[in-house]
Every structure is written in C-alpha cells, then in structure tokens.
Amino acid sequence: SHSEKGVIELMPTSDGDVYGFKYVNGHPSNTADGLQTVTAFGLLANVANGYPVLLSEMTILTALRTAATSAVVARLLAPKGANVMAMIGNGAQSEFQTLAMKAIVGIDEVRLFDIDPAATTKCAANLAGQGIKVVACDTAEEAIMGAQIVTTCTADKQYATILTDNMVGAGIHINAIGGDCPGKTELAPAILHRAGIFV
C-alpha cells in the first residue's frame, strides 16, 4: 500500500509446510511525531493447521538484512580494492550500510550527504570510533567524489533525481536501495541505460 505519507508492504513466502510474512512500513514524516520511520514484524505459521508458531519484531532484522545484502552485492560487483563509499541519505539505515560495507567489503572511508544536515551530523557521531574515516559533505556531488561505491537510501517520493548522469563516472558501483516504490526514483534514467543492472 502506497500513500503520500509512506508505504506499507507485506512480504509473504511459503515452502508448503510453513507460511511466513514480514510486515514493514516506511513513513519518513513519523519523526515529527517522535515515531520511527520504519517498523517491521514477522509471522510464521503452520500451513497444515494455520496456527502461528512465531511472531517476531523485525525492525532491526530489516536493517541488518538490507545492509548485508548491499554489502554482499558490492563485494561481488564493486571494483576490486574499493575502499571509499558515498552514502546519500543519512537516516538510520546509513549506519548499518556503512558498518556492513566495512566488515564485508573493507571500506575505510564513508562520505556522507543528506538534505537534512542534522541527519548527517547524527550519522557521523554514531559512526565515530568505528575505525572508519567519516567525511560530512555539503552536496551529493561532493560525497561521490573519489567513491568507488555509491549507496543511495533516500525517502523522497516526488520523483526526485538524487544522482544525475554527469555525476557518475564509469566503473562506479551503485546500490540504489531507496528506490523501492513508485515515485522513489533516485537515479537519472540515463544512468540506468548505460549500467549493468542487478535486482
């Protein structure tokens, strides 16, 4: 379900013996009310009798899974020896992304940008002492300078273009994780036309 305020998604699966789903939302304006922007929970049920066997909070699991997926993909597809990542969009997921990239890919520098400077300040503070150089940037263009990996994780649903074609050189690995529903585009179409795309 998509609305002007956010998105609610159900992610079901079954192997014939058990049925499970994850419920997750994304509502960027929740912070104005002191609420998390993302919450998730999951249910696992016995297919034979329909009874639930597990109900679990999955907000942290969602953050970990998303970051781990990005890092595993970057390990396989990013240029060998990549050690600098640009992180465009500095909400809570950005910290998980950075730590996963450090652990799995071996990055030693992250360049941060968010349209909300307070988000960048918070992300940088939370990453302090993690053994990674953190550079706060004033623009997306500045953030991607020298980065071999670019991760976008933005919440804009107004067809915003976060990265334009002239910003991204050849050989850059992009994890566009914020473009997950209608209206959340992040990348200029020209980038997609000249890129190898993996979903």
Where are these regions (language model features)?
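N-terminal ligand-binding/catalytic initiation module
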Residues: 1-63, 69-71, 78-81
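Short helix-loop-beta connector
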Residues: 77-84, 106, 169-170
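Glycine-rich Rossmann-fold phosphate-binding loop(s) that bind the pyrophosphate
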Residues: 89-91
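N-terminal Rossmann-fold NAD(P) dinucleotide-binding loop
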Residues: 94-95
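NAD(P)-binding Rossmann-fold cofactor-contacting core
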Residues: 104-128
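Short acidic low-complexity segments
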Residues: 132-147, 163
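Short glycine-/small-residue-rich Rossmann-like dinucleotide-binding loops
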Residues: 148, 154-156, 178-179
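Rossmann-fold NAD(P)-binding glycine/threonine-rich loop
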Residues: 167-172, 176-199
